[in-house]
Amino acid sequence: MGYLQSQKAVSLGDENTDALFKLHTSNRKSANMFGIKSELLNPSELSAVGSYSNDICPNRQSSSSTAADTSPSTNASNTNISFPEQEHKDELFMNVEPKGVGSSMDNHAITIHHSTGNGLLRSSFDHDYRQKNSPRNSIHRLSNISIGNNPIDFESSQQNNPSSLNTSSHHRTSSISNSKSFGTSLSYYNRSSKPSDWNQQNNGGHLSGVISITQDVSSVPLQSSVFSSGNHAYHASMAPKRSGSWRHTNFHSTSHPRAASIGNKSGIPPVPTIPPNIGHSTDHQHPKANISGSLTKSSSESKNLSTIQSPLKTSNSFFKELSPHSQITLSNVKNNHSHVGSQTKSHSFATPSVFDNNKPVSSDNHNNTTTSSQVHPDSRNPDPKAAPKAVSQKTNVDGHRNHEAKHGNTVQNESKSQKSSNKEGRSSRGGFFSRLSFSRSSSRMKKGSKAKHEDAPDVPAIPHAYIADSSTKSSYRNGKKTPTRTKSRMQQFINWFKPSKERSSNGNSDSASPPPVPRLSITRSQVSREPEKPEEIPSVPPLPSNFKDKGHVPQQRSVSYTPKRSSDTSESLQPSLSFASSNVLSEPFDRKVADLAMKAINSKRINKLLDDAKVMQSLLDRACIITPVRNTEVQLINTAPLTEYEQDEINNYDNIYFTGLRNVDKRRSADENTSSNFGFDDERGDYKVVLGDHIAYRYEVVDFLGKGSFGQVLRCIDYETGKLVALKIIRNKKRFHMQALVETKILQKIREWDPLDEYCMVQYTDHFYFRDHLCVATELLGKNLYELIKSNGFKGLPIVVIKSITRQLIQCLTLLNEKHVIHCDLKPENILLCHPFKSQVKVIDFGSSCFEGECVYTYIQSRFYRSPEVILGMGYGTPIDVWSLGCIIAEMYTGFPLFPGENEQEQLACIMEIFGPPDHSLIDKCSRKKVFFDSSGKPRPFVSSKGVSRRPFSKSLHQVLQCKDVSFLSFISDCLKWDPDERMTPQQAAQHDFLTGKQDVRRPNTAPARQKFARPPNIETAPIPRPLPNLPMEYNDHTLPSPKEPSNQASNLVRSSDKFPNLLTNLDYSIISDNGFLRKPVEKSRP
């Protein structure tokens, strides 16, 4: 049987599926959107279907369903509203009432309101889409649907209940759109008029143009409806913004009337389901004639019908009984979880993944079914934003349908549908999730499915060449993909080291390479899951021919066995005398370890270093290059004004960069006369420096760095180069002036000899005269070595730092020795660090330097580091710097000077205390021998101011240093030889064991002088004692001590063997130390 008869039947086959999808998503604001004109809606032809009214808005005195929301005792029914029949073009009212099956179904009435006078037909899906995307997004954009279950038809209800306009506790009305259990429902949207009072509309009135389905709760208890999952249908104040979420309801669920027998907790029905044919396509249009003809015929055939009843057996039979037009205007009756295969046969469509979570849909006779009216609009103005989304949804649905149909998961899907129906049954009995009409876990599945299917890009087709070509490493065989196993990281790592031929043999390189596979757009999640692709490691180059000489041992693959190397290898590798070629591999490693040790040392004074770093950073920010101006345009510089002397002085300078800070007082307190250099010098001849003042109208004085006998050193900003420099201002004395000229000459030579700055010497910048003072500008460095030792608490430096600094100092001395330059003032104060956290150093202060053969001064070097030939008045050369180097290394190790003499007499006594007096040959060459020795060559006794008397050979070097490193002790002793000709040169020092890392197998005797020692070794195998400084000849005349007493002079003991022939033979436990001490002479006991 048909509810609405039509002149032409339109089937719901697959050919009209896309058309139904597009017609529901078309623009609803077109004037002829649905192809229905005003003249087609003839009241005479549609009078049998329903009643008409000229009022767009219903009577405000009629009670609404929202009244029941606010008060449990007040209800209303929209079925009993009487409409005047003067205006028939404004409303279309149809009553359709399908019958239920068995005892679980009852008579239901469908009341549909349509209007074309002031508004347009619209669907709940359109409302949902427009509400999401419209900028207005107000409460006026509502989909007004009233759905309910009422066993009493409209006219009978109007006749039997004359007071139906009053409140009733048995009639309820609900307005639900975009629900889950229903298909797309039609609603009336009035464009010309809006509710003046929305709260009043919700509480006391009913909106015009709604589908009203009512239910009498008292008469139909414990029965499920075809159109709702519960026994009650309530009015929702507005449509949900998104499926499953209720917003702006303006009522509380606790105020709804409860049915105790049903167990409905909240009273709000579940949200109906959006039909599957929504949001898939927007390109198809439905003919206008089908809709108009269907409406005309259906209205004529059902003219005198007030209620149409039919038993509803199955979902397929329901569609067969409906008229063709009802198949178009009413949505397909389907279950929320019907199978895809059976759904295709029954002309129903799969729900998109956005709404239905991509669950297979199966037809079930026992499940609840829903019916909603649908009218497919004309898509004259398609929404461009909705089109891509709809197409992608259709693609996902089709792919899901094909996948399910291919694998045939019918039994599994039916079991899922039964579980889902049971969950819906539970949700229909009440609870919070009963309002949303899905199970508690469906929202999570829905979100996961939406993120999985909606945002996934389209997978491009694989080129045929990859499938057909069998030479490639493709996992496709005969057009079918075979399961492959991804190689592990270890396998990939092993393949890196395979030869290139073996890797290339895996694939046929002769065959033509297939075309590249088009790549997909990679997302962030895909990148995180992709394994790292290792780069190709080049093959190991072959060994050079010189490595394949005699004695070379081939490399072994196993690390568990290391063959013993041949001794011929050391013989073939002869050490070179060049310092640059020695120890090239160990030096970078030692430098890094030394830098770590420097960080540990300076970490104790990190606060001061941070303050210094802030000051340095502020200076670096101020340092910049300034464009100079002429001396006549000095007023253009925003600096300090010129004094009267400067106004006359500035004429001697062509380029003016800086004249001083504006808040600096540049006036000198002394009288401006010629004796004091117009007040710019003090009585010592040093320049009176004012911080913030200029030097030569180019440098800005920042602070003081140091002051010495030659003058003073300032830290300045050079505005010509934009760098920080150290400016040395020499005293205004002729002696120092001449020496400063020599220094400037040597610095210029060093810049020529070392253009790449590789020999650890300060870099010269410029020199000039300013107010009768010679100024020398060099690069700015850090603190000196003495301050480093002081910051470490005079505890000495680590041996790795000492080795690193020693190597750099020897590198400097090597260049000076090759160029025959004597530094003449090598000390810790003249060795500066380049960085506080690094061991890189540079040698400064060449003010006392000279060339060999051009020695001017005899009193040179600092006392603690002064060589013996300088003290004794002998001729000196480059070996004096090697002596100073030995003293500096010893001080870096102990933290104190090795020879701390108060004057030259005590300084020489400190040297003889460890190494003894010098040889007579050296004393004869001394011009000052009478100061330190008597006529017989004996050292004159000397007592210091502290009452300390030092005796020769009273201490050993290892006692003073408290060191057991043989190479280190040997290195210092070779630097501290009496004879300069026997002293170690810088080239020899570069090849010493201490710097090259070769350790001597001979262990020194580190026991003190008065300590027990073991039995002496055999004389034949005893090592040769290290040579000592030559002793003066006058010591032969001294009387020897008694044999029973310890002797302090081993050489005298050996020379007096004629007088005491049995002395050495009677000693059983005796050994000669490094400095010639007899440890414990003991007479041999007689039997």
UniProtKB/Swiss-Prot annotation:
ATP binds at L705, G706, K707, G708, S709, F710, G711, Q712, V713, K728. Residues 62-81, 292-307, 362-373, 429-442 have a biased composition (Low complexity). Signal peptide: none annotated. SMART domains: S_TKc. Keywords: ATP-binding, Cell membrane, Kinase, Membrane, Nucleotide-binding, Phosphoprotein, Serine/threonine-protein kinase, Transferase. Residues 478-488 have a biased composition (Basic residues). Residues 397-407, 527-536 have a biased composition (Basic and acidic residues). Residues 699-995 form the Protein kinase domain. Autophosphorylates at the cell cortex to lower lipid affinity and promote membrane release. Dephosphorylation by dis2, regulated by tea4, triggers membrane association. PANTHER family: DUAL SPECIFICITY PROTEIN KINASE, DYRK-FAMILY KINASE POM1. This is DYRK-family kinase pom1. It comes from Schizosaccharomyces pombe (strain 972 / ATCC 24843). The lineage of its organism: Eukaryota, Fungi, Dikarya, Ascomycota, Taphrinomycotina. The gene is pom1.
